[in-house]
């Protein structure tokens, strides 16, 4: 992360998580109802690390431990236009949710819990408000974990289960955004 953007650096936490899925027993009732992924290329430059790979190698071709003198220092660090990304999320979010699960663009309806990626507290509140979802039905971890990028969704799911909020039989929507600008979401019964 580029230090001139220290205000953004304070949003990021650190974590790793995974979910292990198995076939539910016939009496359990757990189920994956819907899944969807979409990418909007106009947001490609909003969250990126331009360096690395073969285009802008970070390390010297002769010595992989030495910095490449031809490399652009700034290109090797994460860059984010948070306000621009949030604008694009709000522009496309309702349509994405409607395509994921009809009715989600207006309310949670039969969904018990929202388990969102949490880029920031402000972004989380703006998204919930735009979708008409009550904040008390969203599992919130941004205040304790920070933005753990892709790990934030399974970490937040775990927190919801461990705290006793999410129980067997609850229908949940898990969703997030990422570089690209990409959206991903699933609706499941836990």
Each language-model region and where it sits:
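Condensing-enzyme catalytic core mediating Claisen C-C bond formation in acyl metabolism
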Residues: 5-91, 95, 177, 190
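Short Pro/Gly-enriched beta-strand edge/turn motifs at strand-loop
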Residues: 1-3
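Claisen-condensing/thiolase-fold acyl-transfer catalytic domains that form or cleave C-C bonds
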Residues: 90, 94, 101, 109-190
């Amino acid at each position: 992360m580029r230090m001139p953007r220290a205000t953004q650096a304070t949003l990021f936490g650190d974590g790793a998580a995974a979910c292990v899925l198995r076939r539910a027993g016939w009496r359990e009732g757990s189920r994956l109802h819907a899944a969807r992924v979409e990418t909007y290329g106009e947001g490609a430059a909003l969250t990126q690390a331009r360096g690395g790979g073969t285009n802008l190698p970070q390390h010297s071709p002769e010595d992989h431990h030495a910095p490449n003198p031809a490399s652009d220092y700034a290109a090797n660090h994460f860059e984010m236009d948070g306000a621009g990304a949030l604008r694009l999320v709000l522009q496309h979010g309702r349509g994405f949710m409607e395509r994921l699960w009809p009715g989600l663009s207006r309310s949670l309806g039969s969904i018990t819990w929202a388990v969102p990626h949490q880029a920031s507290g402000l972004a989380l509140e703006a998204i919930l408000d735009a979708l008409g979802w009550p904040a008390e039905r969203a599992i919130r971890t941004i205040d304790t974990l920070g933005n753990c990028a892709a790990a934030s969704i399974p970490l937040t799911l775990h927190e919801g289960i461990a705290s006793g909020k999410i129980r067997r039989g609850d229908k949940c929507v898990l969703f997030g955004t990422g570089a690209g600008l990409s959206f991903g979401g699933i609706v499941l019964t836990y």
